[in-house]
A protein has these predicted regions:
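Catalytic-core regions of core metabolic enzymes
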Residues: 1-297
Length: 297
């Protein structure tokens, strides 16, 4: 099994005809994803050939869902239009909304988050992102930009704030493989949290152990630690990026900033280790520990 995404997922791409959208749609097709179309109101009724497939372009998410039965949408639209694209997909009742776009205004994401949490979300849409690499269930489907050749299917569940650390961890543990790897994004507000992914991996019978990657800024890792204590029985190994980050300086992601004693890597490490999660110093050490755990299960 897997979480959120599998071989039966039917994917549309909002912004499929743009430069990044067309490039990554091609790569998703090559990964085995069931891409059933795209959305661009100005090009409705046309089609584009990507990855050897002739993909229809629809005028709206609602039309695309009616015609194709799509249940996943991947968003590749400019930051200024991302909020509207998300709300359109939510109104249409899409099951999973994967927002790749970086640079979305925090206020816009907050409004989308509130919309997701409100009565308008009748379809109970789950959003991943924004500013994320998306989600991959190796050997089955990719909704996002994660290189699908890094690792195959296996027993590890991976949840990470960082895209590049997602890729590195998958490479480090390619000998074991992954049930699902999900990059939740590094912005201050995201649709799916560490806790959401931990709960899903705990419920997934094919996930035997979990790698959780965090970074400086906010308190998501501390809240995840509190959740792990009472709810997660599977082994969890952690890595927190940013032990040497200077105070007050944003480090790559909009949410990766230390203010005083708040959001430090040390505080996150302490919280996680207090509930039995071993937090390693490097990605390689994290992979080595996970490998040891799996060999002893």
């Amino acid at each position: 099994m897997s979480i959120y995404l599998n071989k039966d997922s039917r994917i549309i791409v909002q912004g499929m005809t743009g430069g990044m959208g067309s490039k990554h749609t091609t790569l998703m097709v090559q990964a085995g994803s069931n891409i059933v179309g795209g959305v661009n109101a100005r090009k409705a009724g046309t089609s584009v050939e990507l990855g050897g497939q002739d993909l229809p372009v629809f005028g709206s998410v609602e039309d695309a869902m009616k015609e194709t039965g799509a249940d996943v949408s991947v968003v590749f639209v400019p930051p200024a239009f991302t909020k509207d694209a998300c709300i359109e997909a939510i109104d249409a009742g899409i099951g999973l909304l994967v927002v790749i776009t970086e640079g979305v205004p925090v206020q816009d994401t907050a409004e989308v988050w509130a919309y997701l949490d409100g009565p308008a979300n009748v379809g109970q849409t789950r959003m991943i992102g924004p500013n994320c690499p998306g989600i991959i269930t190796p050997g089955e489907s990719l909704a996002g930009i994660t290189p699908h050749t890094i690792a195959g299917k296996g027993p590890i569940g991976l949840v990470s704030k960082s895209g590049t650390l997602t890729y590195q961890m998958m490479y480090e543990l390619k000998d074991f493989g992954f049930s699902t790897a999900i990059g939740i994004g590094g912005d201050p507000i995201v649709g799916t949290t560490h806790i959401d992914a931990l709960a899903a991996f705990e419920a997934d019978p094919d996930t035997k152990a979990i790698v959780m990657i965090g970074e400086i800024g906010g308190d998501a890792e501390e809240r995840a630690a509190a959740y792990i204590k009472g709810n997660v029985t599977k082994p969890v190994v952690g890595y927190v990026a940013g032990f040497t980050a200077p105070e007050g300086k944003t480090m790559g992601h909009a949410g990766a900033i230390v203010s005083g004693s708040s959001g430090t890597a040390a505080a996150k490490k302490e919280a996680l280790e207090a509930v039995g999660v071993k937090v390693c110093k490097t990605p390689s050490e994290t992979a080595s520990l996970m490998r040891e755990i799996l060999q002893n299960l």
